[in-house]
């Protein structure tokens, strides 16, 4: 596909919208998907919509990160700084990104059963995934693993959040929970637990054992994925929980 051509000059079978209908969205390039949102082109060299979409990706690659990672958290002013992108195009892109985030973030419902790391991570996504600051949250459950509440305990900086076991167990007692799952996000996208993460988990497991309120897991969320500390550490063998 020639990026300098107008969409009208491109054979119908190669136009982004027509290709999406014929082969499906997942088979379109990132530039083609952006072109559908942009609707029209221009910018330097009077680029087509596809060309302008590719130009956006090229500009974002200057951040030395995957352009889609940059696009996920981009501000309107950063988009409009790209030649050929005005407020209308920028807001259309940002609205599409936000809609995509919401579509893949499952909101918790009352009495929902949380019986696996996958289910827990799914309901935590809305509060923890794709955040620019570290957040620490707790899922509070009843004896049947049914959801009582999901609470964000603290919001920190881009690299750390400070939380004390006392704050977590205060919420457990307040909500009359009998089990809990803790979680926090890493804005960098890394799912590797830090030494502080391990230490806090140990402290909470000890406290949970003492109070006879099982801590089922500690999840780390980032970049659309998650990690379960229960699955990758031996902490639950050292501090068994009656779950």
Swiss-Prot record:
The keyword Hydrolase applies. Gene3D superfamilies: Cytidine Deaminase, domain 2 (3.40.140.10). Residues 113-235 form the MPN domain. A motif (JAMM motif) lies at residues 184-197. It comes from the Bacteria. Zn(2+) binds at residues 184, 186, 197. One of its GO terms (molecular function) is metallopeptidase activity. Pfam families: RadC (PF04002), UPF0758_N (PF20582). Keywords: Hydrolase, Metal-binding, Metalloprotease, Protease, Zinc. One of its GO terms (biological process) is proteolysis. Belongs to the UPF0758 family. This is UPF0758 protein MAE_44350.
């Amino acid at each position: 596909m020639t990026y300098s051509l107008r969409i009208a000059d491109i054979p119908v079978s190669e136009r982004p919208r027509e290709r999406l209908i014929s082969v499906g969205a997942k088979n379109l390039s990132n530039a083609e998907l952006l072109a559908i949102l942009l609707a029209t082109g221009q910018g330097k060299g009077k680029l087509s919509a596809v060309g302008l979409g590719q130009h956006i990706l090229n500009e974002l690659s200057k951040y030395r990160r995957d352009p889609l990672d940059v696009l996920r958290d981009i501000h309107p002013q950063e988009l409009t700084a790209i030649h050929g992108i005005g407020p209308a195009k920028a807001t259309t892109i940002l609205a599409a990104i936000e809609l995509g985030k919401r579509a893949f973030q499952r909101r918790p419902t009352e009495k929902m059963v949380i019986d696996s790391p996958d289910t827990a991570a799914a309901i935590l996504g809305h509060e923890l995934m794709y955040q620019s600051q570290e957040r620490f949250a707790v899922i509070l459950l009843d004896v049947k693993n049914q959801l009582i509440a999901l609470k964000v305990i603290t919001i920190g900086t881009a690299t750390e959040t400070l939380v004390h076991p006392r704050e977590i167990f205060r919420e457990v007692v307040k909500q009359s929970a009998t089990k809990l799952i803790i979680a926090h996000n890493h804005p960098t996208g890394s799912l590797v637990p830090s030494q502080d993460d391990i230490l806090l988990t140990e402290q909470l497991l000890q406290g949970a054992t003492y109070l006879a309120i099982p801590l089922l897991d500690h999840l780390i969320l980032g970049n659309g994925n998650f990690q379960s500390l229960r699955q990758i550490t031996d902490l639950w063998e050292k501090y068994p929980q009656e779950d």
